[in-house]
């Protein structure tokens, strides 16, 4: 589970990211990211400053009719994000849209694709090539 401060869950927030955010694609995932205006909310280390980056995952029944399968994919993506959290810049709202081809992916592939998408969207600035597992 992602820390509460890093969760994007209001439907209006998802709509805003879809409407105004940039998008990047790989074969299994689509990333939509929106840089938020600077606000003085708490960030995870307790200091005042930019709002923490918030992450939402969207996976439709087109990916799988079985909720068990969809939830497993979401857990793998959340685990990959937990590993990438220290590298993320503050002040972003991110939505990951899962494509039906993601059924073939394992954790390492999700981690590599997420890192690649985040670098393309300039949410993180270094790319390790997936060697950080």
Predicted feature residues:
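Positively charged, solvent-exposed patches that mediate nucleic-acid binding
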Residues: 1-133
